[in-house]
Amino acid sequence: MASFIKAWGLVIISLCYTFFIAKLVPKGIKRLILFFPVFLIFFIVPFLIYSLHLLGITAFFIAWLANFKLLLFALGRGPLSSNHKPLSLPIFLAVSCLPIKIQLSPKPTKTHSHEGSTEGPLIYTIKAVFVVLIIKAYEYSTKLPEKVVLTLYAIHIYFALEIILAATAAAVRAMSDLELEPQFNKPYLATSLQDFWGRRWNLMVTGILRPTVYEPSLQLFSVLGPNYSQILAAFGTFVVSGIMHELIFFYMGRLRPDWKMMWFFLINGFCTTVEIAIKKTINGRWRFPKAISQVLTLTFVMVTALWLFLPEFNRCNIVEKALDEYAAIGAFAVEVRRKLTAYLF
């Protein structure tokens, strides 16, 4: 915990530096150069943390999201620059280092299938209970088929990530009264790969990859025409996402990458671009029934995840490390309760 506090203290100091630099230096190359030391610090910070959970959160929040947000901010773009008035320092710090984005437009009316998730505390409590049950099931992983264990990993990732992101957004919303954009949008209801990756799964990542990778690539390849530029930009976005996922697992496992996770995103990216091309060709003249599209989409994502993405958790011993941390937390809680009982009675 001490290493985590020191690491995040360094993060806060670095963000304060960028905040005040932006007051003095206009957007552009000069500001970008002055931000460069912060980019390096944010890539190094996860190495200072020993707890698997705190390391994973820091790698995602800081090494990936915060660095990408600051890159955009240096150029006068992104969530740190897109407000009508400059952000105050506390709001700047929150938006920089947390997976949140201020919703600028009024909350849309629920008139279509892509509205943000409106799940309440009860649903998140149920999901938290499922996470606890899954963690308990890991104790019997040696007796379960490998694919069953990997499927439990997938459910664990989805529920845990959704709970962490929703809790973070709820805390910021309660303290600042800001309206924030949703984090997930029922990815299990996706009707296509484009729908799953672009509109439903981990929308914070989608929202930061769009201005940092997709839109610049779209402009770069515009000489090839709108169809080819969109396909190449979409594929490039998956490439960058794959690299960042490999980096996060390198932080957590400290093992040389075998690039299977990269292949997961390359395959999903390639198939998504093929899907986009087919949609443009048929131009809405024919489509699968919605239920069949949902089953095919979820099946494809799960099959490729079971093949390439989820086995990386075993290779990096992430589950074993996580169980050790849960046991340590449980032992600490028992010790605290024992001391409190002895003190009070």
UniProtKB/Swiss-Prot annotation:
One of its GO terms (molecular function) is O-acyltransferase activity. Disruption phenotype: No visible phenotype. It comes from the Eukaryota. It is found in: Membrane. The keyword Acetylation does not apply. Its main location: membrane. It is an enzyme of class 2 (transferase). GO terms for cellular component: membrane. GO terms for biological process: sterol catabolic process. The chain crosses the membrane at residues 1-21, 32-52, 54-74, 86-106, 120-140, 148-168, 231-251, 258-278, 291-311. Keywords: Acyltransferase, Lipid metabolism, Membrane, Steroid metabolism, Transferase, Transmembrane, Transmembrane helix. It is a multi-pass membrane protein. Involved in the esterification of cycloartenol. Not implicated in the formation of sterol esters in flowers or during seed maturation. Has a substrate preference toward saturated fatty acyl donors (16:0 > 18:0 > 16:1 > 18:1). Does not require triacyglycerols (TAGs) as a fatty acyl donor, and is unable to acylate diacylglycerol to produce TAG. Belongs to the wax synthase family. This is Acyl-CoA--sterol O-acyltransferase 1. It comes from Arabidopsis thaliana (Mouse-ear cress). The gene is ASAT1.
